Every structure is written in C-alpha cells, then in structure tokens.
Amino acid sequence: MSAGGHGVSRRQLLVSGVCAAPGISLAGSRPRVTHGVQTGDVALGRAVVWARSDRPAQLVVEYATTPSFGGRRRVRGTVASAQSGWTARALIHPPPGQTIFVRAWFEDGRTRGEPAMARFCTPADGVRILWSGDTAGQGYGINPEWGGMRIYETMRRREPHVFIHCGDTIYADGPIPAEVRTPLGVWRNWTMPEKLKVAETLDEFRASYLYNLHDDNVRRFNAEVAQMWLWDDHEVRNNWSPGADLAGDGRYREKDISVLARRARQAFLEFAPIGYASRAEALIFRHLPVGPLVDLFALDMRSYRGPNNWNRQIMESGETAYLGERQLSWLADGLERSRGLWKIIAADMPLGVVVSDGRDAQGRPRFENCANGDGPPLGRELEIARLLQAIKRLNLRNVIWVTADVHYTAAHHFHPDRAQFKDFLPFWEFVSGPLNAGTFGPSPLDNTFGPQVIYCKAPPPGQSNLPPSAGLQFFGEIEIDRSSRCATVTLRDIGGGVLFSQRLEPA
C-alpha cells in the first residue's frame, strides 16, 4: 500500500484535491470522520485502517497496545478527495497477539478533526475467524423497529480476530423500498433516495456502501473487528459476468455491463478496508498470513471469468475461465509456500452447488458458478479440477473452503470415492449466509467432485426469500486452538446459537 498522503503539503491539501464536498464550507469547521473507522486485511505485522471524511483532508492514525495510547505510533495515510469518494486509508504495523487501540482523524491543512476510535485484535497462536455474506439484499435493509442488522451485533460479541465477508457486501441492483410485504408481515426500512433505484453512476454505487454504514450494528462491528472483504455479483448486478445483456432490463439506462462493472469495482475498492498502491493495480484476490496456525486466501471469482454460458465445454478456453490462469497459478503457488498449518480459502461461490442463470439462445441451461450438473469436469470445472489435482500432487493438507452466496448454511464434505473426478484429496467446504437478506435454498449438488451434505439449514419446503425476522440468517466460525492445533468449524444462527459443529484434526 502506498503512503499516498505522506509528505502532502498544506498547499496541496488546500488546492490540489480541492473540489470540496457538496454542502461543506471549509472555513470555520473541522474535517469529520463521517461513518466510523474500519480495519482490515490484518496479517503478520500489518493492517489497514479506513475512514471517510466530509471534505478534502488527510487521514492520520495513531495506534497503541493500551487504551491510554502510551507508546503510540502515528501514521499519515492517504488524502480523502472527491476522486476517492472521500475515503482514505493508512497502513499500520501492529505487533501480534495484542489488542490494538486506534484513533483516527482528518487534517485539512488548517484544522485537525475530532478523532474516531476503534480497536481490533491481532492473532498470535489461537485464532477465531468468522465468515458470512449477503448484506442488505432482496429489499431487506435497515429496519429500526427490528433493531437494524442485528447479526452484526451477534458476531461482534463473538470477539473474532478476523471476519471474512465472502461477497455481496452490497446489493447495487437491489433498491431498498420503505416497506416490503412478507408472509410474516411488513418489513419497514430506513432508506435514502439513492437506494430507491438500481446503481448505475459511480455515486450510486458508493451510496450502497454508505447505506450499510448508517446501521449502528455495522458501525460498532467495524470499529472492533478486522475484516477481509471479497466481492461477488451484487456489487455490480445479479449474476454479473462479461457481456451480460441488459437490453431487456428497463431498470437500467446504462446498458453496457463493462461500464457498470468498472464503476462498481472503483466503489468497492474505495469502501473496502483493503490496502493497495493504486486502484488500477489493486487485486481482490490476496493472501493474508495470519499466524503460524493459519493462512487466509481470498479469491476473486468475478474479475477473470468468461461470460456465463452452458458451461459444458470439454476443453479450456476464454469461455471456461473462472479464476483465470494468473489467479489459479497464484493460489497453487501460495498454498505450496504457505507456512500456516491451516489453509483457509475464502470464495464468493460454492464449488459443488448448482447455481443457474437462465438459458442461452439455444435454450440450454446457463450456469453462474463452476457446477453444471453431474458428470466429469466440464467448462469452468476444468480449472477447479486442475487446482484440486495440484493440491494433491503437492500433498497439501488441512485445506478448508468457506463461502456464502446461496443464502443458506451448510457443511459439505468432498471425497474422491463419491466423485466422478477422483484425482484430489478429501476436503471440507462450509457455507454460511445471509447476513441481512432474503433466505433461500437449498440448491442441488453436482457430483463431479463428490460433495455430500453433512448439514444444511434453509427455509422449509415451499418457502423462499424469507425476511431476516424469520431468524434464518447465518454466519460461520472457525476456532483454531493453539494447544491441540485443531480447527473447530461451527455454523451459527442470527442469535449466535450453534446449529452444527465439526472438529477437524490437523494432518
């Protein structure tokens, strides 16, 4: 990550970025942290601190291992500007195994704003990781009568070291109306003008992130838990892939999916607590060495895929691309080099669940992820088969997959004895979500890699798109014990109750 704002002069702050935020007078007032502080991408010896300003100003961060800020260190971060959606970030270097106390403020060359506070824990040996996905989907937004996005408060109380958001961090294509009528009654949202339509402009994509930050539970969670964000389809549009045809979707005046994707990516990188030297060079797939017991690998299943299609090609090509060659090689190499006992791969879509995307011009089923129905590897499955082969060839043990996307929770065990393709080591995949969205499922499995449903919690037969008030909102937890070195994976409900738990012994 660049020190972008380091060495920025008073004159640069006052004139070079200076298209002021609308409605803000620079004179006589202080720059303000508008939506709290987030921390993210915590790895050995580094973390990112994120905040948003109300005007052109430079982010300044102090951090320490005591609440009194004795022995504090100060870092100057990037400059918030109109070009960054008024967001800024700073790279800090905290010690492992500590609670890190953070205060962040903005300076505009004339004045220093009031600090906003945060804290997070850096892992050492024992680690607690949560994951889930799907925030503010299907029109279910912030319902003050119900207590807002309550699952974030439940997760905060679990005191994790890291939370992995497996994607659908927003629903850019999902307006938030004032009311949603459901079989359980009327769901009443707090909403705002930008969320009454689908996102098309850059500012509308930004507004979806700002909407979530209006929730008290989300902001409290952000201020106490370091995060690792992935993206999925709804950051752009449902089932987004290159070449998607918007001609028949009257909600969109902008019909070029590549234009929407470019704007969506910029907004995601502005609001995600990710470190990077420049947005143009930023990668959503990345490796976070959390400690001696665990390495995290975040995947990007969107940026490098070919168009969604019938997905049953017998040879790889641009049409079958999923992770893409660069990311696939990076992942295999990173897993081989990993020093963490447990290797957790965070994906935005499950491997063996069939996710459909309508039909193509020839009337053939079209698929959204790699799964395409029973049988040998075809289409996008060819990449996954190569990856699983590499893991076996390198004898890489203790690999766990976590994901979201399908709006229910499940534990899947993959084994070559049940599979059509047999050249891989057995592994587990755990699914959890949604966080604050409609609940669906379950979806059918594809037997190519031999998945078995060990546990599943979804709506009763005949019911779907249930509101958060139905109680079927889920997150997962991985607890790695420093003494036994075992990983215990637990699927939890909106109140934190245990639905399923699996203890995994290290190989």
Regions found by a protein language model. Give the residues of each.
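Metal-dependent phosphoester/phosphodiester hydrolase catalytic core
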Residues: 2-19, 23-507
